[in-house]
A protein has these predicted regions:
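Terminal alpha-helical segments
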Residues: 1-131
Length: 131
């Protein structure tokens, strides 16, 4: 049976792997997909925080970053909340064909580069908070 720290480590490692995928997708000019994986990376580090803050080692099956962090000791600024809400779109809306065309239009190189930089900053901040 895994310890709480082993569960947290699993989610952290998955977050790092997904971040590498986001970077590769960006380099391959798959901007929408890179933002999907950036969200996935943040989701997994948020789940690590959720495990740390809760009795259970199994986080809720949700993709909502703010919901996951609302059940932890992490305090977000309004700016962070706005960014995480925006990033949530790429996980939820990015799954459905009727929404994908809208997201493709806004997912330019410049847009994705800016959002990935913000996401990386959030990922590093959240990873540091786990230590």
């Amino acid at each position: 049976m895994k310890t709480k720290e082993e569960h947290i480590g699993h989610w952290v490692n998955q977050s790092i792997d997904d971040w590498e995928a986001a970077e590769l997708l960006f380099k391959g000019r798959k901007y929408l997909h890179s933002l999907f994986f950036a969200h996935l990376s943040l989701e997994k580090v948020c789940k690590a925080h959720w495990i740390r803050a809760n009795e259970s080692n199994i986080p809720p099956k949700t993709h909502n970053l703010i919901f996951l962090l609302s059940n932890t000791a992490i305090e977000l600024t309004n700016e962070q909340k706005e960014f995480l809400l925006e990033l949530n779109r790429f996980q939820i809306e990015g799954r459905y064909p009727e929404q994908i065309s809208k997201l493709f239009k806004i997912s330019t190189h410049t847009f994705a580069e800016e959002k990935l930089a913000q996401a990386k900053k959030q990922q590093e901040w959240l990873l540091n908070k786990l230590q």
